[in-house]
Amino acid sequence: MTVRAIHEEDAQELGLPGRHLRWLVSKDAVHANNCSACVIRVAPGEKVTPAHSHPNGEEVIYIIKGSGRVLVAGDVRPVTEGTAVLFPQGEVHMLHNTGSEEMKVVCFFAPATGLDNYQMHEGVDFPD
């Protein structure tokens, strides 16, 4: 069996609203069939917008660096380095970097997904 590996710096970076994204595990990157993963970087004060959901699967995020808050189905919780959060299938969610440094997050998806499995929810935001 061939080892299927990719270094973060070798993955194409996509500039998306509120974040920079690199797919690390996907059908294209390493021929994954049942899961996918990406790393995102979120600048201080930025929100991953628009709020969205994944109608065909779950997402787990793991905060590698930085701090902020998540919105999941109307519930807001703080997140810091070392925090993992489940975004259940179909639940509207978003991420906000409230810290003073760049936030770095690994996002895991099951089953495998891509940007085509994002259902956008314009107008949903954090309550302030």
What annotation goes with each model-predicted range?
Residues 21-26, 38-54:
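Conserved short histidine dyad/triad with adjacent acidic residue
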Residues 37-40, 86, 100-116:
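A short hydrophobic beta-strand segment most commonly corresponding to one strand
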